[in-house]
From Swiss-Prot:
The protein's name: Putative S-adenosyl-L-methionine-dependent methyltransferase Mjls_1072
GO BP field: methylation
Gene3D superfamilies in UniProt: Vaccinia Virus protein VP39 (3.40.50.150)
Organism: Mycobacterium sp. (strain JLS)
Signal sequence coordinates: none
């Protein structure tokens, strides 16, 4: 089903199901002695959502055709590298405030070693926030920093909701927008960065990722995966969730608004973390993706 300005979701449907998919990839990527990441909560969160396909995937009960199995392995590696990039961003920022936009099943507030006095804000749809908070509490997990959830759709007035939860716009902040931009219309992407800029004191930092020609390139490979998923009973076509249209390049957009920006390609990020970047047609859509970090002047 195509997106609309008023659509909503839980963690088993639409955009929310992609958060569960990413958590499943993090759970798989956390296994083994050479795992690049360690997310001890991802597996339990995915099982709590209860989407049968993702649970079977965790249990090794899904058999995919060769091309799709290879694509799944690539996506698991991509999520491992992406997760580690954002983990390292927070760990290196040293800032007292952190904001996770569209937090989904992100458990960084619980699993990262935050400095004493850190405050972490998570912003997402109310149902998503409630589910994750309740599930982690049931698991006996406690946040490793002061966690303040902001239950609001990013299409609404989230800056006001964030300030109402105690956010201090005069203090430097570390922001992440992970796996988010492709699900926003181009004009909403611009508004997101405008709002972040307005809320960011000098010294604030931002990490995100940008996929040039995202809709066309990633949509085609997503459709192939959707066909495979349907064979296993999962009705999720990610291509329907992406917004097409020409986007302002993130690097240029941020620089024009007072940020010092660095960008690294996905193959460079793989090399940085000691992982070979895969080859083949299936991964060409991923090659152009950029890991972006910025500091507010």
């Amino acid at each position: 089903m195509a997106r609309s300005d008023e659509d909503s979701w839980d963690l088993a449907s639409s955009v929310g199901a992609t958060a569960t998919m990413v958590a499943a990839a993090r759970a798989v990527a956390s296994r083994g002695p050479e795992a690049l990441i360690d997310d001890p909560y991802a597996d339990a969160l995915v099982r709590a959502v209860g989407v049968e396909y993702f649970v079977k995937l965790l249990d090794g009960e899904i058999t995919l055709e060769a091309d799709n199995a290879a694509m799944l392995a690539v996506m698991t590696d991509v999520m491992a590298v992406r997760t580690r990039f954002f983990d390292d961003f927070f760990l290196s920022s040293g800032l007292p405030q952190a904001v996770i936009l569209a937090s989904g099943l992100d458990a960084r507030a619980y699993r990262l070693p935050w400095p004493s006095g850190s405050v972490v804000y998570e912003i997402d749809q109310p149902e998503v926030i409630e589910f994750k908070t309740r599930t982690l509490a049931d698991l006996g997990a406690s946040p490793a920093a002061e966690l303040r959830t902001v239950a609001i759709d990013l299409r609404d007035d989230w800056p006001r909701a964030l300030r109402d939860r105690g956010f201090d716009p005069t203090a430097p902040t570390a922001w992440i927008a992970e796996g988010l931009l492709i699900y926003l219309p181009p004009d909403a992407q611009d508004r997101l960065f405008d709002n972040i800029t307005a809320l960011s004191a000098p010294g604030s930092r931002l990490a995100t990722e940008f996929h040039p020609d995202a809709g066309a390139r990633i949509g085609a490979s997503s459709q192939r995966m959707a066909e495979e998923w349907r064979r296993h009973g999962l009705d999720l076509d990610m291509a329907d969730l992406f917004y097409d249209g020409e986007r302002n390049p993130v690097v240029d957009y941020l620089r024009e608004r007072g940020w010092e920006v660095e960008a690294r390609s996905r193959p460079d990020m793989f090399a940085h973390y000691g992982r070979p970047f895969p080859t083949g047609e299936a991964v060409e859509a991923l090659r152009q993706s950029l890991a972006v970090t910025a500091t507010r002047r």
